[in-house]
Amino acid sequence: MSTASVIIIGAGISGISAAKVLVENGVEDVLILEATDRIGGRIHKQNFGDVPVELGAGWIAGVGGKESNPVWELASRFNLRTCFSDYTNARFNIYDRSGKIFPTGIASDSYKKAVDSAILKLKSLEAQCSGQVAEEAPSSPKTPIELAIDFILHDFEMAEVEPISTYVDFGEREFLVADERGYECLLYKMAEEFLVTSHGNILDYRLKLNQVVREVQQSRNGVVVKTEDGSVYEANYVIVSASIGVLQSDLLSFQPLLPRWKTEAIQKCDVMVYTKIFLKFPQCFWPCGPGQEFFIYAHEQRGYFTFWQHMENAYPGSNILVVTLTNEQSKRVEAQSDQETMKEAMSVLRDMFGATIPYATDILVPRWWNNRFQRGSYSNYPMISDNQLLQNIKAPVGRIFFTGEHTSEKFSGYVHGGYLAGIDTSKSLLEEMKQSLLLQPLLAFTESLTLTHQKPNNSQIYTNVKFISGTS
């Protein structure tokens, strides 16, 4: 049985940042157990059409504000190549099913209507929470352009997906990662600072890949972790950095069971599914000038192949288009073949650009929802929610601590939220370990009094000595 002071379950950005803080503060015997064959979690690069594409997190959001985004600092430090992204132009590049772009005036009016409706929705939710009735009910989008803008507004720009604090604190600019090393190189660079590496490969025994944790057993004396291949590990504490979707699934079991307040909070947190579908073409047939990186398809079904982006700014000559689907559309596409998805995407593109455009030569469809080690893309707390929900998800249970972007009070759903959450969780654990050390002399004194007032018993003496020594 392998032992450590702290076991960290998951090697995403939260797990890596948590481990780094522990090692830098003297807790060097950490053990990171990762279910897959790589570190990074939902930050994952894959080569497609001769260029690297980001299957999961792809942007550094919140740059240029009064405070410096810590992930932007890492990107600058390690010379990560990025490209500025401006979503705002997308609303003026909205195509109908006949291939015509909606006039600017109509697009502006529809966007204003959608914003006003979102504000009314927020006020209505606030009124419900306070037991009042809203003065005016928000309108629902009905036409294809209204549905498209509603999708863009809520799935890309508003607080239901993006915590406003990201933009208030760190700034409103967003940068697309376009580096051959991938976004994940930031994690490898972080790992190099506390793990043994060689030529970009992590060789340190404290990182164990392909270790699927299935059971976490907690007792007064420590925590035992069991994996799918039968391996058993023991530690004084455990940090669980699995995603909220994994916590909601049956992949991880806890003994004893987590308390009801914990499990109820975990189940109440929404999980967003965000799917970027990549299409490779023999040549470029879409507009590529200034302000045309993003474009929108207006359809009668909300979110149906709505949001498009070309990769020419990031990788000139790549001839790659990306279409983003979310939630139910994502789950629908994950359940069908890539060929069927390509057929649907081509039908949409021919609506916008005509029947003579070339057929895609390749397609890449990530499946975050059906990945049992991820079960979704990121957490999504309700626009109006009790802060107690997040606090309960975040709170430790005995020797088991929890981290991840879903435990970030201000930046849930973001890479920097996960990064900061790992740091915060390790700081809390270090404080817990410090308090435990301070209590040891008192516990030893209490146990010694117990020994002097009880009839000697070999097994009892052994138990007390074992507990006092701190070896259990």
UniProtKB/Swiss-Prot annotation:
Any GO CC annotation of this UniProt entry: cytoplasm
Compartments, as annotated in UniProt: Cytoplasm
pH effect summary: Optimum pH is 8.0.
Binding site for FAD: 34, 42, 213, 405
Pathway listed: Amine and polyamine degradation; spermine degradation
EC number from the UniProt entry: 1.5.3.16, 1.5.3.17
Gene Ontology MF, one: spermine oxidase activity
UniProt keyword terms in alphabetical order: Cytoplasm, FAD, Flavoprotein, Oxidoreductase, Stress response
Required cofactor names: FAD
Gene Ontology biological process terms in this record: polyamine catabolic process; spermine catabolic process
Tissue expression notes: Expressed at very low levels in leaves, stems and inflorescences.
Regulation of catalytic or functional activity: Inhibited by guazatine, N-prenylagmatine and 1,12-diaminododecane.
Co-factor: note: Binds 1 FAD per subunit.
Reactions catalysed: spermine + O2 + H2O = 3-aminopropanal + spermidine + H2O2; N(1)-acetylspermine + O2 + H2O = 3-acetamidopropanal + spermidine + H2O2; norspermine + O2 + H2O = norspermidine + 3-aminopropanal + H2O2; thermospermine + O2 + H2O = 3-aminopropanal + spermidine + H2O2
Knockout consequences: No visible phenotype of seedlings under normal growth conditions. The double mutants pao1 and pao5 exhibit enhanced tolerance to salt and drought stress.
Role according to the record: Flavoenzyme involved in polyamine back-conversion. Catalyzes the oxidation of the secondary amino group of polyamines, such as spermine and its acetyl derivatives. Substrate preference is thermospermine > norspermine > spermine > N(1)-acetylspermine. No activity detected when putrescine, spermidine or N(1)-acetylspermidine are used as substrates. Plays an important role in the regulation of polyamine intracellular concentration. Involved in the production of hydrogen peroxide in response to salt and cold stresses.
Protein family according to the UniProt entry: Belongs to the flavin monoamine oxidase family.
Protein name (Swiss-Prot/TrEMBL): Polyamine oxidase 1
Naturally occurring in which organism (per UniProt): Arabidopsis thaliana
